[in-house]
Amino acid sequence: MITNKLRRTLIVGALVSASVLAGCVSQEKYNKLNDAYVKLQQAYQGDEVEIKQLQGELKVTIKDKILFPEGGFRLDAKAQAVLAKMVPTLSGFQNTKIVVRGYTDSVPIGADLKREGVTTNLDLSSKRADNVVDFLLKKGVSANLISAQGMGESNPVASNNTPDGRAQNRRIEVTLVGPGN
């Protein structure tokens, strides 16, 4: 029979152990994301790519003009070369969610895109994110880890009232979230 004093000691010990283990996992996650940050900074040196290490995640933002022709969603050879730079880093993760989000400005969809079945900015951003994911999958990034989301004109990072603001809002974000191994 376990006494109350022994029971309290065991509970406190279990809580301390859990806290220590959680700290180790957090430090390991931080180290893995930091290593990825350094590798991506080196890979994209001089490119129009922004890499940010945030609380428990790593975000790579690529301006759409690097990846897509204006109003388009297909990746050309230059775009594929830009995306290929992140493949070695992304392929090193086994237990980390990789979310590819496409964003647009608020300019209405033109007639050319409508003829291709793209009727809204949400459709356009979804096709862009899907094409990035398809490319990364073909290059060996695990299908179990990666997903695509079209965000349309939601979550602008700048005003859509100026050409520069609209250009900033047209982007792809690749975010790594999760345990980091």
Give the residues covered by each predicted segment:
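Bacterial N-terminal signal peptides that target proteins for export
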Residues: 1-14
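Periplasmic peptidoglycan-binding/anchoring modules of Gram-negative envelope and division proteins
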Residues: 39-46, 71-102, 106-108, 133-137, ...
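Short, solvent-exposed beta-strand/turn patches at coil↔beta or beta↔helix junctions
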Residues: 55-84, 104-121
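Bacterial signal peptide processing site
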Residues: 25-28
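Periplasmic OmpA-like peptidoglycan-binding domain that tethers envelope proteins to the cell wall
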Residues: 73, 103-181
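C-terminal motif of bacterial Sec signal peptides marking the signal peptidase cleavage site
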Residues: 20-23
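Extracytoplasmic
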Residues: 44-47, 55-57, 63, 85, ...
